[in-house]
Amino acid sequence: MDPNTPSAQPISFTASDGYLLRGFCWRHPDADARRPVVIINPATSVRCRYYARFAAFLHRHGFDVLSYDYRGIGESRPARMRHFEAGWIDWGRLDFEAALQYAFAQFPGQPVQVVAHSVGGFLIGLAESSHRVSRVFSMGAQYAYWRDYAPARRAGLLFKWHVVMPALTAVFGYFPGGRLGWLEDTPKGVVHDWTARHPRFEDIWRSGGARVLPDAERDELVRRFAAVRADTLAVSVSDDEFGTTSAIQRLLGYYRSSPRTHLHLRPDAIGQTAIGHFAFFHSRFEHDLWKIPLEWLRHGRLPPAPKGEVVALRAEAPGEPIPKPA
């Protein structure tokens, strides 16, 4: 573990299908039912260790924190990756659900909150118990619909992630991202889900795909998103080629019962040259950007005078029809 996070302890817990998941926990010695426990949902194929300094930061400010790796990644990697079966749906329905159950059992009565990066914000809605989450902070949260990629980078991203990545996956039985320096090695099911070209996420698992779910099961997934009522802050940055404003809004549309706030930042407005999709969780932002999630998780509000564009979306009434994202 990172030497600057001495309070982190290794943990393990089992998903409902028996798969063993591993991660780390930053826990205060005294129990306090008022203290929130924060679960960190990583981005696709990013190890939970990447968020260690951020987790330690939250711990120093009074939170209990749990980070973990999805099956196939980092601490939860199997002995053999070739043809290992795992997709986004497993990461959400099984792995994040298991993390929730671990938090409920280990921190009884404490509010459960989530910090989610990229696809981690999408996975929240797939879990059966996600309606019990009280607050969410997400950074660049989306599910990689290709038309939402930044226009200036779209062609290059399509070639890299929608042509080269699946081609290599077909050869190796998984995506060997580690040896290429393209994130971690990634299960083939996750590659399929990432490269599916559907504007609505539930259509990833329609007939003709690598994994097919019955219509009723896919409809149930959409209802799970609508059942989430967590106060949600979704942050996007102008130089994020994946988490564009359209991508963020597309995902937020599914969390229709949650009060949602979208904060869009420009690096130059906060004295930075770049932030992109990954740098938000770098420790150099501890004294500026990290104040945003800290204030949200503590009080459910933005810091005074945030240097960005703010869009608030109301929670919709239960009887309203589920909107169809464009």
Which role does the model predict for each range below?
Residues 1-30:
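N-terminal cap/lid segment of alpha/beta-hydrolase-fold proteins
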Residues 35, 40-46:
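Active-site glycine-rich loops that stabilize anionic/oxyanionic intermediates
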Residues 85-106:
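Alpha/beta-hydrolase active-site loop
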Residues 117-207:
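Alpha/beta-hydrolase-fold enzymes
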Residues 228, 234-236:
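Short beta-strand/loop motif that positions the catalytic acidic residue
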